[in-house]
Amino acid sequence: MTKLKNEVTSLESKKTSRRKFFKAAAATGAVAATALAMPNISVAQSAVTLKMQSAWGPADADPFFTMNKQYAQKVEALSGGTLKIEVLPVNAVLKTAEIADGVSTGVVDAGHTVTAYWYGKNPASSLFGTGPSYGFSSQELMGWIEYGGGRALYEETLKATKLDYVGFFAMPMPAQPFGWFKKELKSLADIKGMKYRTVGLATNVLQGIGMTVLQLPGGEIQPAMKTGLIDAAEFNNPSSDRNFGMQDVSKFYSLGSFHQSQEMFEIAFNRKKFESLSKHHQNILRIAAEAANTDNYWYALKRYSDDLNKLVTESGVKAFATPKDILAEQMKSWDKVIADFSAKDALFKKIVDSQKAYAKSVMKYLLLNQPDYSIAFRNTFGDPANVKV
């Protein structure tokens, strides 16, 4: 009898323990469910927001502004909302030429721009975007930065220019058109004495082939051409040009040029602000630039080609290839410009020598290995100049 009583007591004790366990589990589950149902409360309290001055905009009609926002979206997505970037459209706080200094001094936390915009502070800046080709495109130039010693030289250039920020690069831009003219170009003689807009080292290169060059912000190009301040101009791509309304002041669009055959965005962060972030957030800012690098490029190719077709079919623009004698003269002028600057600036020469060494190796492989894709295009569609889309 005593044995049976003890067994009953033991069984009831086990049942009580199980009930306590399930009650505790249910309470824990309720807390977890509540936390899952309200994940944004803690995120919102701990989120860091960086103010980024863009050199582009103010609307999505500007493809570069869209690309800037794509970067910001990737930062927020990768961080789970704990790191955000407020993208400020062009001239919101700083003018385009002021972005580098403004980021360096902390007027804004970050900037989305190109290195050519601080060319006036140091001509070597243009070598990290709008420099000579040596056979490579923007893709290979960015490869040099990350795998050919370019990043250390970029940091050295920032230090020499007294710019205190951390920079990343994104978006390997296609070669820029030679630009908009009052008539179709037939030869080098057609551009002699012409008043032309560009930026960076291209100003020196095109002065060397007989053009008179002015440096103007993007938004001032179309009005300057309309009033006759300049005779011709380039900016960057068919989409930006169409957004500026270049088709309203010119009907002749010269495609293909070595004046700026490669460029990419510089994404700059004030150094103190950057170093105050967690290592996790610092890595996100870097990795987001690498992700935007691909996304921006895919987006650009589709949009640029669509807008070129619209310029031709809807606005009556004649798109034509830049005459070969102009391209040849550009290369000669580049040689002289690079030699002149290298003789005056040891750092400039150091950068050029590094780029040449990288290009000599990498481009030998690519040029020997890559087929001429224009052969395949012509086989399928015909002469690109005559293909209607």
Spans of features found by a protein language model:
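Core domains of carbohydrate- and sulfate-ester-processing enzymes
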Residues: 148-150
